């Protein structure tokens, strides 16, 4: 305690160390931060529910006491080294920030490319310095997001003028949806307004088409917990919660169960190929989408929407990719009802989400290319983690050598 300007007391749960003649207070403080101190402290802990130490524990500790002049030298040297560490840390943060800004600037040139030739030119510029640009997890994640953005904009693979345009595909899906409504297999919904010019985030390539999310999927809510189910025959089933539905993958580490009426099991059944979309949570959770890719029976909670694709011509993984893109995330952020740190969307807002649909053959090519890029990014991350681990081992070895 330095320069205390007023009379003060200390609480009973604190231990006061008074100044002792021939000891430098700063040296004592250095000792109190050392491994030698903490090792002795842990060995002297009493109690299990709430571990604690007392003055007797401190009294029994071994305290290495050098001559006064050496204490002063130690304090001076430690302070010099700590200042150096702070400077290195600050320099590292500045370098990382500058590096990330450079990466983001160069990646933006890719998404801003006006044509395939310009994209190839900008990519070549990045490729020349690939090993020096993508050396952090943040830069690799930025690369991954840029590739995703290029994919949904139709800039990842060249267009083939011989491909059937997406407009023809959407006509067939509309006919099939109308038949399903007529047969009573899906409910007819109140029509939504068409996509406005303000809602279109970018210009589509030739052969692509904008549609509403509800144009290609039948959206259903899930099981509501806490219902009165007295005198009904129940079965116990597993169900999916918001925590299970991540952005582009499933987290099935903890799958809970719920009782529902036996006659409702088909209503809430999630089948392979269904899309799962989160209703809410924190602002970054809203609209999180993944594909159910398993054969076993499971249902969805009411905070997770189920989207069943109409027909079999649209790849569910394309819709998953687009719904997780920056454009859909921006849509959900603007459409959602937001309170402090929380946000949610309703079924109507999900129905009205604009989606870009490419020709079927092009969608297949995009997904193959996207998977290749994602695998590359994961390999880069593993190599980076391995290199960082090696650096840590080397630093530990050098530190041990210096100490010993």
Model-found features: residue ranges?
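Short, surface-exposed loop/turn microsegments at beta-strand edges and helix-strand junctions
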Residues: 1-11, 33, 229-237, 249-259, ...
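Sequence-specific dsDNA recognition surfaces
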Residues: 1-3, 194-199, 214-229, 243-275
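A short glycine-rich beta-alpha junction/loop motif
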Residues: 6-15, 46-65, 297-305, 314-317, ...
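Extended boundary segments
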Residues: 17, 23, 209-239
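Non-catalytic DNA-recognition/assembly elements of restriction-modification systems
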Residues: 68, 72, 83-104, 108, ...
């Amino acid at each position: 305690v330095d320069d205390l300007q007023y009379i003060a007391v200390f609480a009973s749960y604190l231990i006061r160390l008074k100044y002792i003649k021939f000891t430098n207070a700063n040296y004592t403080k250095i000792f109190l931060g050392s491994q030698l101190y903490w090792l002795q402290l842990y060995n002297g802990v009493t109690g299990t529910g709430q571990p604690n130490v007392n003055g007797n524990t401190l009294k029994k500790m071994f305290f290495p006491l050098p001559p006064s002049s050496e204490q002063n030298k130690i304090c001076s040297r430690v302070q010099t080294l700590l200042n150096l560490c702070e400077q290195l840390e600050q320099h590292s943060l500045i370098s990382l920030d500058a590096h990330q800004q450079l990466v983001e600037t160069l990646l933006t040139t890719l998404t801003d490319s006006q044509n395939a030739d310009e994209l190839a030119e900008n990519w070549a510029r990045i490729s020349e310095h690939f090993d020096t640009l993508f050396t952090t997890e943040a830069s690799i994640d930025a690369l991954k997001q840029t590739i995703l953005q290029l994919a949904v904009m139709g800039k990842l693979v060249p267009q083939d003028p011989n491909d059937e345009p997406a407009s023809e595909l959407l006509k067939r899906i509309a006919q099939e949806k109308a038949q399903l409504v007529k047969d009573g297999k899906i409910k007819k919904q109140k029509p939504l307004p068409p996509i406005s010019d303000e809602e279109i985030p970018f210009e589509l390539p030739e052969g692509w088409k904008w549609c509403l999310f509800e144009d290609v999927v039948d959206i259903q809510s899930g099981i509501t917990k806490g219902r009165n189910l007295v005198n009904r025959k129940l079965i116990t089933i597993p169900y999916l919660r918001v925590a299970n539905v991540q952005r582009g993958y499933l987290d099935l580490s903890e799958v809970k169960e719920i009782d529902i009426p036996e006659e409702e099991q088909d209503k809430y059944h999630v089948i392979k190929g269904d899309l799962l979309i989160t209703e809410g949570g924190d602002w970054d959770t809203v609209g999180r989408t993944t594909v159910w890719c398993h054969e076993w029976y499971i249902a969805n909670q009411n905070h997770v929407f189920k989207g069943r694709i109409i027909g079999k011509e649209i790849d569910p993984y394309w819709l998953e990719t687009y719904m997780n893109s920056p454009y859909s995330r921006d849509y959900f952020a603007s459409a959602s009802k937001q309170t402090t740190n929380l946000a949610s969307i309703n079924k109507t807002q999900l129905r009205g989400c604009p989606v870009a649909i490419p020709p079927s053959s092009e969608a297949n090519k995009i997904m193959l290319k996207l998977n290749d890029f994602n695998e590359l990014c994961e390999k880069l991350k593993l190599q980076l983690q391995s290199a960082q681990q090696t650096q840590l081992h080397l630093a530990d070895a050098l530190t041990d050598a210096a100490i010993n």
